[in-house]
Amino acid sequence: MQSSSPSTSHCSQIPIKIQHHIAKKRQVRRRRVDLDCGCSYYIHLDCINHGFTHRGVHHCASSNEWRLYLRDNKSPIFHDNQTQPTTIQQQIQFTNISNQVQPQLEEGTGDSQMFSQLPHLDDLTVSDWSFFKSL
């Protein structure tokens, strides 16, 4: 007996409950990284070349990225016997910012950018303002 469905693909879908059950059984391949501050994070084993900043310190997930950010005697730059490109020999200067709070811009009393091109804002009636508020 032929199907009355107009679809040419007649394969059945796996129910969502079964999909969730399969996904829960699958183990996530990741490793735990403990930071000096006491925090820890997990990184997927297939995730490379991604870094992030936590409490003002940049953390890297790949050995190539660590080579740029480590700047002490434990750095792989000083222990690697291979010839390095000349770009690594340039000293990268990092500034230690003691104040981690970024200043906010002050509020102005002038026209906003959105309404700066509208003529005669003083001529708007109460019904006009109620219309704008309803949007």
UniProtKB/Swiss-Prot annotation:
Which keywords has UniProt assigned to this entry? Activator, DNA-binding, Host cytoplasm, Host nucleus, Host-virus interaction, Inhibition of host innate immune response by virus, Metal-binding, Phosphoprotein, Suppressor of RNA silencing, Viral immunoevasion, Zinc, Zinc-finger
Q: Which InterPro entries match?
A: Gemini_AL2
Region listing for Transactivation, in residue ranges: 120-135
Q: Give the UniProt record's GO annotations in the biological process aspect.
A: symbiont-mediated suppression of host innate immune response
Q: What does the PTM comment state?
A: Phosphorylated.
Output the Pfam families linked to this UniProt entry.
Gemini_AL2
| ZnF (unnamed) ranges | 37-54
- Any one GO MF annotation of this record: structural molecule activity
Q: What is its main location?
A: host cell
Q: Where is this motif: Nuclear localization signal?
A: 17-32
Q: Name one GO cellular component term.
A: viral capsid
Query: Is this entry keyworded Kinase?
Result: no
Please give the family membership noted in the entry: Belongs to the geminiviridae transcriptional activator protein family.
Function, please? Answer: Strong activator of the late viral genes promoters. Acts as a suppressor of RNA-mediated gene silencing, also known as post-transcriptional gene silencing (PTGS), a mechanism of plant viral defense that limits the accumulation of viral RNAs. TrAP suppresses the host RNA silencing by inhibiting adenosine kinase 2 (ADK2), a kinase involved in a general methylation pathway. Also suppresses the host basal defense by interacting with and inhibiting SNF1 kinase, a key regulator of cell metabolism implicated in innate antiviral defense. Determines pathogenicity.
Quaternary data? Monomer. Homodimer. Homooligomer. Self-interaction correlates with nuclear localization and efficient activation of transcription. Monomers suppress local silencing by interacting with and inactivating host adenosine kinase 2 (ADK2) in the cytoplasm. Interacts with and inhibits host SNF1 kinase. Binds to ssDNA.
Q: What is known of its domains?
A: The zinc finger and the transactivation region are involved in PTGS suppression.
Protein's UniProt name: Transcriptional activator protein
